[in-house]
Curated annotation (Swiss-Prot):
<dbReference type="Pfam" id="PF02652">
    <property type="entry name" value="Lactate_perm"/>
</dbReference>
<feature type="topological domain" description="Cytoplasmic">
    <location>
        <begin position="400"/>
        <end position="408"/>
    </location>
</feature>
<comment type="similarity">
    <text>Belongs to the lactate permease family.</text>
</comment>
<dbReference type="GO" id="GO:0015129">
    <property type="term" value="F:lactate transmembrane transporter activity"/>
</dbReference>
<feature type="transmembrane region" description="Helical">
    <location>
        <begin position="14"/>
        <end position="34"/>
    </location>
</feature>
<feature type="transmembrane region" description="Helical">
    <location>
        <begin position="537"/>
        <end position="557"/>
    </location>
</feature>
<protein>
    <recommendedName>
        <fullName>Glycolate permease GlcA</fullName>
    </recommendedName>
</protein>
<feature type="transmembrane region" description="Helical">
    <location>
        <begin position="379"/>
        <end position="399"/>
    </location>
</feature>
<feature type="topological domain" description="Cytoplasmic">
    <location>
        <begin position="221"/>
        <end position="225"/>
    </location>
</feature>
<feature type="transmembrane region" description="Helical">
    <location>
        <begin position="42"/>
        <end position="62"/>
    </location>
</feature>
<feature type="topological domain" description="Periplasmic">
    <location>
        <begin position="335"/>
        <end position="378"/>
    </location>
</feature>
<feature type="transmembrane region" description="Helical">
    <location>
        <begin position="200"/>
        <end position="220"/>
    </location>
</feature>
<dbReference type="GO" id="GO:0015295">
    <property type="term" value="F:solute:proton symporter activity"/>
</dbReference>
<feature type="topological domain" description="Periplasmic">
    <location>
        <begin position="247"/>
        <end position="248"/>
    </location>
</feature>
<feature type="topological domain" description="Periplasmic">
    <location>
        <begin position="91"/>
        <end position="130"/>
    </location>
</feature>
<keyword id="KW-0769">Symport</keyword>
<keyword id="KW-1133">Transmembrane helix</keyword>
Length: 560
């Protein structure tokens, strides 16, 4: 078997090598933010650039470069695109059945103020979905819900991407934290506890930030009590759950407490002016809210039973994806499990264990696995799809109409699915060629200032892979090693990789493609990217400052 060892300074120096490795990433930013190319076009050109640089600059064998691209593309189709197809299918069923009118009415009965609807649906309910499912489903579902409530697609997608910042680190029952523990050897409980001492600051900030994006300082002054209830209840619960229970449940508990607290609060309080129609403002790119009124929420004309039936697809989804991510269920499909025979593991030819990581990332050359797992029953998307099938019968859609809705879903998602495949192919080429490691080593070389840049490493990882879990797998060990070299807590920097990663989710090409697909913005990925990029950089800087202060000033906040 022919092997190839990654080269991290192929141009002779780390700085120049990093500049070359940056070319595909810079092009992707420019393609979306300046050239305004469609997502699948930008992704395809970026993929071609990354393959050429991998082969000619980083000396990756041609067959391995194309194998990495192929592996990334099929990974984009399964499990990522499958999750999105199932989530959008579920939403479209509620619309086709006419039940979304009841969902809309039930939300308006709590508040008809769109600023508060974003907090309730985008922030709190989205966090619940992130805790249970993760991997794109929360943004797809909450974005579609907000469009159904009357939000313009760009705002629905952008606001949900930014709202999804707070819960990502503990998503899918703590998988990102658990993976960080696996690759570093640090107790996941300690990593989760440390992240739980960083992210609550962001959790409090995000609701205020969302309102400010929609209605400026005026909106914050009018709605600050509700924003404080939503963010404060989430942050406090997030801290206590992560520090005293474990990394698996912070999103579930925080989201439930936030939803209940905000819903109950809105029963006894409402802003002086209720804002019900959002449009883009003329100054500072702010979102200004029109049609002020003080009429308050409109009582629902539907019974409790009708409301529960309308919401049942999302209730079933939450229950099923929670079951799907629990250890006993996963054990059924693990080696030795009762249903392991239903899982197909395919070793990627010309790639599996043929690419070797090298020092300083690892002590000795270590082969990288490349195994595609096709798990038709245990995949998260299947849980959502089963929820959709059950919903066909509960909502009375009918099998024939349900099949038609599914076909319509596939047709509407053809370009987003291609975009997802392309960006994952680019990400995998970047990873297997060593380009991502070269960029990481540049950041790691910042010495005593590295605690500030540490979250940006997680940010970069999530931008490249679309996943906080993958970012931790990619850079977790580098964070730990660098921490020991500069005499800083390794638990702090590994947690910072996770915390910083959440701020990159809103600009990840994968997330952008998912949000556009769910809100009917196919081909408008550049608009959404330009809408979220500055917020991503600001949030990453906030986490960087928090990490720097915890490393050298507020050392009492460290997990001992």
């Amino acid at each position: 078997m022919v092997t190839w060892t990654q080269m991290y300074m192929p141009m002779g120096g780390l700085g120049l090598s990093a500049l070359v490795a940056l070319i595909p990433i810079i092009f992707f930013f420019v393609a979306l933010a300046v050239l305004r190319l469609k997502g699948h076009v930008a992704g395809a050109i970026t993929l071609i650039l990354s393959i050429l640089i991998a082969i000619f600059a980083f000396k990756m064998p041609i067959d391995m470069a194309f194998a990495a691209a192929g592996y990334g593309f099929i990974y984009g189709l399964w499990p990522i695109a499958w999750i999105i197809v199932a989530a959008v299918f579920l939403y479209k069923l509620t619309v086709a059945s006419g039940q979304f009118d009841i969902i809309r009415s039930s939300v308006i009965s709590i508040t008809d103020d769109q600023r508060l609807q974003v907090l309730l649906i985008g922030f709190s309910f989205g966090a619940l979905l992130e805790g249970a499912a993760g991997f794109g489903a929360p943004v797809a579902i909450t974005g579609a819900l907000l469009v159904g409530l009357g939000f313009k697609p760009l705002y629905a997608a952008g606001l949900c991407l930014i709202a999804n910042t707070a819960p990502v680190a503990f998503g899918a029952l703590g998988v990102p934290i658990l993976v960080a523990g696996q690759v570093t050897g640090i107790d996941p409980f300690h990593i989760g506890a440390m992240a739980g001492r960083q992210l609550p600051f962001l959790s409090v900030l995000v609701p205020f930030w969302l309102v400010a994006m929609m209605d400026g300082w005026k909106g914050v002054k009018e709605t600050w009590p509700a924003a404080l209830v939503a963010g404060g209840s989430f942050a406090v619960t997030q801290f206590f759950t992560s520090n005293y229970i474990g990394p698996e449940l912070p999103d579930i508990t925080s989201a439930l407490v936030s939803i209940v607290s905000l819903a109950l609060f809105l029963k006894v309080w409402r802003p002086k002016n209720t804002e019900t129609a959002i449009s883009m403002g003329q100054s500072a790119g702010a979102m200004v809210v029109n049609k002020p009124s003080s009429g308050g929420p409109v009582p629902s004309e539907y019974s409790l039973g009708q409301i529960i039936r309308a919401w049942s697809p999302f209730l079933i989804l939450t229950v099923l994806v929670t079951i799907w991510t629990m250890k006993p269920f996963k054990a059924l499909f693990a080696p030795g499990g009762a249903f392991y025979s239903l899982v197909i593991n395919f070793q990627i030819p010309h790639l599996h264990q043929q690419v070797l990581k090298a020092a300083p990332i690892v002590a000795q050359p270590t082969p990288m696995d490349a195994v595609f797992k096709f798990d038709p029953l245990s995949a998260g998307g299947t849980a959502i799809f089963i929820a959709a099938i059950i919903s066909i019968f509960i909502l009375g859609v009918g099998i024939k109409k349900g099949i038609g809705v599914f076909a319509e879903t596939l047709i509407s998602l053809k370009w987003p699915i291609l975009s997802i495949g392309m960006v994952l192919a680019f990400a995998f080429v970047t990873n297997y060629s060593g380009m991502s490691t070269t960029l990481a080593l540049v950041l790691a070389g910042t010495g005593v200032m590295f605690p500030f840049f540490s979250p940006f490493l997680g940010w970069l990882g999530v931008f490249l892979t679309g996943s906080d879990t993958s970012s931790n797998a990619l850079f977790g060990s580098l964070q730990s090693t660098t921490a020991q070299q500069i005499n800083v807590s390794d638990t702090l920097l590994v947690a910072a990789n996770t915390s910083g990663g959440v701020t990159g989710k809103m600009i990840s090409p994968q997330s952008i493609a998912v949000a556009c697909a769910a809100t009917g913005m196919v081909g408008r990925e550049s608009e959404l990217f330009r809408y979220t990029v500055k917020h991503s950089l600001i949030f990453a800087s906030v986490i960087g400052i928090i990490t720097l202060l915890q490393a050298y000033v507020f050392t009492g906040m460290l997990v001992s």
